[in-house]
Amino acid sequence: MNQSILSPFGQSEERAIAAINAFKQGNGVLVLDDEDRENEGDLIFPAETITVEQMTMLIRYGSGIVCLCLSDEICQQLDLPPMVTENTSVNKTAFTVTIEAAKGVSTGVSATDRVTTIRAAVADNAKPSDLSRPGHIFPLRAMTGGVLKRRGHTEASVDLARLAGYKAAGVICEITNDDGSMARAPEIVTFAQKFGFPVVTIEDLVAYRQKYDV
């Protein structure tokens, strides 16, 4: 990653701390992965505090595929099996079956309905029967060990939530440009400065976790 483009957001550790602090306040963070991986930026919010306004932003500026990243423990609690028996995707993105809240939603597509579904999934004592399958929220199972084991947005979102004191659950969506193409680092920086989001790389989070053993 070209560090100079990220200089407005500080050095690596400063970016990691700013991202964790933003999460603690229920605010969003833009996370960039490695250039030789997806080379994309995701807007991520803590699942426990997601609002309709934040969901609307994800839908408006993102790819439309809003994902709920969950620890393996939560996936087991909710009985969310893998979407497929054999995962042949390039980055082994661990989609589970899709979900909808069993109560309180209409079609499940609106920002309000999607927030209702996420709240049902991350509620205290949530159980499998609280969710219908399939639905319009795409859960992703994070690898145990987080970004230290897999340098993906899924693991980054769960790590950020955990480091901020939340349940291991984050809501993510890839940011796209106006022409529908994927936003890369330069566009992510512009987007972040326009809306006031911190930017952090997965490399930053790996370094922070390794330094502080967290």
Swiss-Prot record:
Reading the lineage from the top rank, the first entry is Bacteria
Query: Cofactor: bound how, per the entry note?
Result: Binds 2 divalent metal cations per subunit. Magnesium or manganese.
**Magnesium: present as a keyword of the record?**
yes
List S-S links within the chain: none
Provide the residue positions that the database annotates as binding Mg(2+) 1. Answer: E38
Query: Positions of the site: Essential for catalytic activity?
Result: H136, E174
The pathway it acts in is:
Cofactor biosynthesis; riboflavin biosynthesis; 2-hydroxy-3-oxobutyl phosphate from D-ribulose 5-phosphate: step 1/1
Q: What is the protein name stated in its UniProt record?
A: 3,4-dihydroxy-2-butanone 4-phosphate synthase
Q: Name one GO molecular function term.
A: magnesium ion binding
The broad enzyme category this protein falls into is: lyase
Function, in words: Catalyzes the conversion of D-ribulose 5-phosphate to formate and 3,4-dihydroxy-2-butanone 4-phosphate.
**Family matches, as Pfam families:** DHBP_synthase
